[in-house]
Amino acid sequence: MMISEIRQELTDHIIPFWNKLRDDENGGFYGYLSYGLGLDKKADKGVILHSRILWFYSNAYMTLGGDELLDNAKHAYEFIKNNCIDYEYGGVYWMMDFEGKPADTMKHTYNIAFAIYALSSYYRASGDKEALALAYRPFEDIEKNTLYEYGYREAFDRQWRLVDNEALSENGLKADKTMNAILHLIEAYTELYKADGNEKVADRLKFQLGQMRDIVYTPDTNALKVFFDTAFNLVGDIHSYGHDIEATWLMDRACDVLGDEDLKKQFAEMDLKISHNIQDIALEDGALNNERDKNEIDKTRVWWVQAEAVVGFINAYQHSGDEKFLESAKSVWENIKEYIIDKREGGEWYSEVTFDHTPHDYKETVGPWKCPYHNGRMCMEVITRGVDI
């Protein structure tokens, strides 16, 4: 039942919505659609948004087939190849204007990771060896320009001089290093290794998994730390429920792709503990709360947190056989259907909904961070995992 509903959501709602945002005049996809569904054709175009769109169409094609999906993937690929990559200094830009010229030339490890993720997927979908070569450019740029004794630095100007990490700092905190960046480097390197089997990529992927296991994970609480200074000292007291449940299945996936049996066992045990913890403390009224900051719980229902919860709970069920995880996945999907999916003509999913089910009308429908990657990926993961309820 759930698989058929989610397949329909992908094919009849999410994909058609994003198809309409293709910009054939200036390349790429339009960068902003308001809560009121007003399209701004001259809005800046986020590079993270475009990497995620490229990943989405590439994987939708590999999951469903269909020439239109591959064509839209190619359209996103051409925009990234021709506009977003900095061929002079390396990496990718942070933001383009509506015509495809650089609007913000900051280099960020998180953003560059998504370019690797997307280009690797497009290579797998299309077989275009140029895309694989382009995926290795940002990989080498990260390895050359961001490494230091504690792993990977995150925020730089165009010429790789360090700048404040404002892009990934939140809650009034300044964080030099983030769990978020490490997680999405793991995600990106997993996809690149899956595409090409390069042992250097495998080695760096194992290094990052080790950082998550040995530094970011807290065994006493079965939670992941969020923000750090340059020496990996904790900054703030935040628990991000969505990132925890997303990390469980992404780390399991990385170990599966690496084929390392010891790592598989270590992370399966750790990730199940994290999943149980999230189920116990964050699942409320059929949906996942957002985060804890010190003693305050933010109960906002954020679109991506709900999508990752469905995948994470299904993954936990597959590793444990515990049907309570399936029940949790089902409850979150039912909540998504009822309250997160935007049923207005021309809508997709609301960005955020309050605990009592009121959409936040100040949060855009499409923007630099509001994309088809989390909800689209949820659909594809449910389809390909084949676990029905």
Swiss-Prot record:
GO terms for cellular component: cytoplasm. Keywords: Cytoplasm, Isomerase. Optimum temperature is 30 degrees Celsius. Pfam families: GlcNAc_2-epim. Gene3D superfamilies: 1.50.10.10. Its main location: cytoplasm. Belongs to the cellobiose 2-epimerase family. This is Cellobiose 2-epimerase. It comes from Ruminococcus albus. The lineage of its organism: Bacteria, Bacillati, Bacillota, Clostridia, Eubacteriales.
